[in-house]
Structure formats: structure tokens, C-alpha cells
């Protein structure tokens, strides 16, 4: 028996006031529908049917490389009609799990509970109790057993008083589902084919109907406009922040942090306000992350410090190392143990060795730098000749004076000293002192320029 997931993603989302299909709007830097697809994989889906309509080309350009069966709903005639478009991809013995592309916070654990609640060849529906159920379909019970779902516009006064509502998420047996979908009618206030009508059909046919509920109602809330999208974003961030704190992070203010990927932290990590973490970020023990830092696809080792307003992207920061404030580690950069870069230092595709330092105002690109090296302010590795990149090698215990340019390819030997203001175009041997600046001249009585009168 296969788990066949149908994700409804055909809506335009008019209230978003956007050319982008609604389900492509992001939560935590990932489209809503991608969150749902990932959750479907997490519950062990054997196949995913993505029912699309408006903006199909944009959807396929974003999601096209994934293992999905694309099912077109040419006309938007209701949720029942949408699911029916996938009938040819549903086997009789499938368990069909129906999800929604604009409900991104649904948890795998909730769906697992729903599937567990379903009896053999039965129908399981996910419900939730709301203090204000206005706008939602109500769960109709008799003797505590579900007998149907009534939509808001079709409900009478007694039914409108029901607080248990339909989330739309359900698990159904493939054979019966296809039969029920074929019996749907659009004879209702909306003139649509309601998926919810299959619940009454299941009751009629004597099929066991069971229910499950999520831990929080926010899991089943959708986003129809940008206000609701922002509310879901905040809910996602609150949940992600809570997870970090339970793992051992101290968050200066959990409401002022953005987590946009897979973040893992060690013990006693301190994270200040307005930090953004994106992609896969791994943080060791006793790490300090300063205010406004941005971490993207990076590794921060034990006892390291990322000072305020620094950016670490696709880079590694070793144990005891530090970066910032206002430092930038670009892809391929690595700080070894106890290395340091200070304010306005940029590194790309370069390694700064153990205990080495670049305190301020430097660019280090395509470079291999040994241990115990001092990089003076204003140092530049000139790595690009207009066509190709070249490597700079600086061996252990080198002292590079301020405002030095190293024109790659070039190698500086161990213990060498480069005088301030030098432009190095040739290799330097170990323990040499090299100075290339012009000899200082003194011109007495030099007349300074005078501004012309207008």
C-alpha cells in the first residue's frame, strides 16, 4: 500500500496582489509549497501529485527538478475538482494524503498522527477547534461520530455554532476516493465541487471516519494575503527560535532573529539580535554571534566569535577564531584556529592560518596564508589579471606592512617582512626584508595650489 500525496497548488492568490503564484511566496526564504513538499517527503511519500493551474511555468521553473507528477487543473472548479485531476495517478490500494500548497507550517508529526488514526480502508480528516470558526467548514457529528462537513455559506444557525472545523487535510483510500470524486455535485452556494462532500459519502457507505488534531492551530493556517503571510513567517520564526533555545542557544531576543534553513547549535551559544541564519549553518559550543550578523551555509567552531554586522557565507571559522565587526567571509574562505579578521576585511577562496591576523581594511582573495602571519591595514592580494585568478602564498610568521599590494602569482617565504606601502610582484625568500616604495623626497618652500576666483 503506497502513500500517494496530492498537493493542491492551482490557486492564483488574487488577494496577494502579485504576479507570483500564491504558493511560491516565501516563508523563511523557501516557497510555501516547498515547505509542504519537504513535509510530504518526511512522512515517507511514495509519490507526490502537484495539482497546478495559474503560473504553471513559474512553478515548474522553481520546482521542475524535483520528483513530482505535474497535474494540470485548467479550470478552478473547487477542491474536489482539483483532486479529481490526479485520479489517473492514484492506484486503488493507495493511501491518498491531501495537502495544500499554501499551508506551509503543517508538521510531519501531525500527518503521521493522522495516518495512524485512519482505520483500514477508512477516511481520516484533520480537524481543529477554534474559538472563532467563521469562514471555515464545520465538522458535523452525530453521537460523536463524524457524518459530514458543512461549508460556512451552506450552514444553518445550529451548524454555525460548531467550533470544530475542517482543515481540508485528509487521508483517504484510493479506490473509494476516486468513486466519491466522481459523485460530487456543484449544487451549492459556491457552485463548486467541494472535496468536503466526500465525508458525507463515506458515512453513507459505512466507511470508518476518524479524526486527528494538530498540536497548534497555526499548523493548518493558510496565507491568502501578505498580512497572513507575515503572520505565518512570525509563527515559523518563533518555532525555529524555540528549537534553538532547547538545543542550547541563548537568544538575546527570540522575536528578533531570522532562521531561514537548517541550523544546529552546540551548548552555551550566545546569539544577539537581528541575526540572520540561512541555508545549512552549524555552530559549535560557546560561540558568540554579534548583532546583525548574517550566516549562510557556514560552519562556526567551538569558542569562535562572529562580531556585529559581519557576513559569513559558505565559509569556515575555526575554534577560538574571530571575525569582525563588519567583516566579510565569502565562499571558500576559512579562518584556522585562533585566526582573526577585523573590521572591513574581506576574504574569498582563501585560508588564514592558525593565529594569523588581518586587523582591518584588507582584501584577501585566492590566498593560502600560514600561521602567525600579520596582515597590515590596507593590504590587497591582487588576484585577478583581467582574465584569470592567481594564487598568493604567504608562509608562516610573515609580517606584511600596511598598504601592501601582492600581485599574484607570488609566494612570500617564512619569516619575511614586507615594508609598508610596497608592491610585491616577485617571490620573496624566507627571512628577507623587502621594501619597494619610492625614496622619500623633501622639497622646501613648496607652493600649494591656490583656488581660482570665480
Swiss-Prot record:
Keywords: Acyltransferase, Cell shape, Cell wall biogenesis/degradation, Cytoplasm, Magnesium, Metal-binding, Multifunctional enzyme, Nucleotidyltransferase, Peptidoglycan synthesis, Repeat, Transferase. Mg(2+) binds at residues 102, 224. It catalyses: alpha-D-glucosamine 1-phosphate + acetyl-CoA = N-acetyl-alpha-D-glucosamine 1-phosphate + CoA + H(+); N-acetyl-alpha-D-glucosamine 1-phosphate + UTP + H(+) = UDP-N-acetyl-alpha-D-glucosamine + diphosphate. GO terms for molecular function: glucosamine-1-phosphate N-acetyltransferase activity; magnesium ion binding; UDP-N-acetylglucosamine diphosphorylase activity. The keyword Repeat applies. Binds 1 Mg(2+) ion per subunit. GO terms for biological process: cell morphogenesis; cell wall organization; lipid A biosynthetic process; peptidoglycan biosynthetic process; regulation of cell shape; UDP-N-acetylglucosamine biosynthetic process. Its EC number is 2.7.7.23, 2.3.1.157. In the N-terminal section; belongs to the N-acetylglucosamine-1-phosphate uridyltransferase family. In the C-terminal section; belongs to the transferase hexapeptide repeat family. This is Bifunctional protein GlmU. It comes from Shewanella woodyi (strain ATCC 51908 / MS32). The lineage of its organism: Bacteria, Pseudomonadati, Pseudomonadota, Gammaproteobacteria, Alteromonadales.
Amino acid at each position: 500500500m503506497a502513500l500517494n500525496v496530492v498537493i493542491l497548488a492551482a490557486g492564483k492568490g488574487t488577494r496577494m496582489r502579485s504576479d507570483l503564484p500564491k504558493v511560491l511566496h516565501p516563508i523563511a526564504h523557501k516557497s510555501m509549497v516547498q515547505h509542504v513538499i519537504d513535509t510530504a517527503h518526511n512522512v515517507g511519500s511514495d509519490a507526490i501529485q502537484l495539482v497546478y493551474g495559474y503560473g504553471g511555468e513559474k512553478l515548474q521553473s522553481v520546482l521542475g527538478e524535483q520528483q513530482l507528477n505535474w497535474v494540470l487543473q485548467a479550470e478552478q472548479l473547487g477542491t474536489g475538482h482539483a483532486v479529481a485531476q490526479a485520479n489517473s495517478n492514484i492506484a486503488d490500494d493507495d493511501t491518498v494524503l491531501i495537502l495544500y500548497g499554501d499551508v506551509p507550517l503543517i508538521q510531519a508529526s501531525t500527518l503521521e498522527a493522522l495516518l495512524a488514526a485512519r482505520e483500514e480502508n477508512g477516511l481520516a480528516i484533520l480537524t481543529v477547534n477554534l474559538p472563532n470558526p467563521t469562514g471555515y467548514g464545520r465538522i458535523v457529528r452525530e453521537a460523536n461520530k463524524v457524518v459530514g462537513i458543512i461549508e460556512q455559506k451552506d450552514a444553518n444557525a445550529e451548524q454555525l455554532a460548531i467550533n470544530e472545523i475542517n482543515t481540508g487535510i485528509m487521508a483517504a483510500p484510493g479506490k473509494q476516493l476516486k468513486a466519491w470524486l466522481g459523485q460530487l455535485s456543484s449544487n451549492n452556494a459556491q457552485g463548486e465541487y467541494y472535496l468536503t462532500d466526500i465525508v458525507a459519502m463515506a458515512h453513507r457507505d459505512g466507511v470508518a471516519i476518524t479524526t486527528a488534531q494538530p498540536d497548534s492551530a497555526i499548523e493548518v493556517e493558510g496565507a491568502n494575503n501578505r498580512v497572513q503571510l507575515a503572520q505565518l513567517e512570525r509563527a515559523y520564526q518563533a518555532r525555529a527560535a524555540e528549537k534553538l533555545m532547547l538545543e542550547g542557544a541563548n537568544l538575546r531576543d527570540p522575536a528578533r532573529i531570522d532562521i531561514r534553513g537548517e541550523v544546529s547549535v552546540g551548548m552555551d551559544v550566545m546569539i544577539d539580535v537581528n541575526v540572520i541564519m540561512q541555508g545549512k549553518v552549524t555552530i559549535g559550543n560557546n560561540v558568540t554571534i554579534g548583532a546583525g550578523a548574517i550566516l549562510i551555509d557556514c560552519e562556526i567552531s567551538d569558542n569562535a566569535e562572529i562580531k556585529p554586522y559581519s557576513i559569513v557565507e559558505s565559509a569556515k571559522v575555526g575554534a577560538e577564531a574571530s571575525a569582525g565587526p563588519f567583516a566579510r567571509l565569502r565562499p571558500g574562505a576559512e579562518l584556522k584556529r585562533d585566526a582573526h579578521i577585523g573590521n572591513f576585511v574581506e576574504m574569498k577562496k582563501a585560508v588564514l592560518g592558525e593565529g594569523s591576523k588581518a586587523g582591518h581594511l584588507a582584501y584577501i582573495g585566492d590566498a593560502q596564508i600560514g600561521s602567525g602571519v600579520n596582515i597590515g591595514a590596507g593590504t590587497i592580494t591582487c588576484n585577478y589579471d583581467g582574465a584569470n585568478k592567481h594564487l598568493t602564498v604567504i608562509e608562516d610568521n610573515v609580517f606584511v606592512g600596511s598598504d601592501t599590494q601582492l600581485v599574484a602569482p607570488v609566494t612570500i617565504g617564512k619569516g619575511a617582512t614586507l615594508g609598508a606601502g610596497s608592491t610585491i610582484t616577485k617571490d620573496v625568500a624566507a627571512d628577507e626584508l623587502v621594501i619597494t616604495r619610492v625614496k622619500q623626497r623633501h622639497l622646501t618652500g613648496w607652493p600649494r595650489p591656490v583656488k581660482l576666483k570665480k
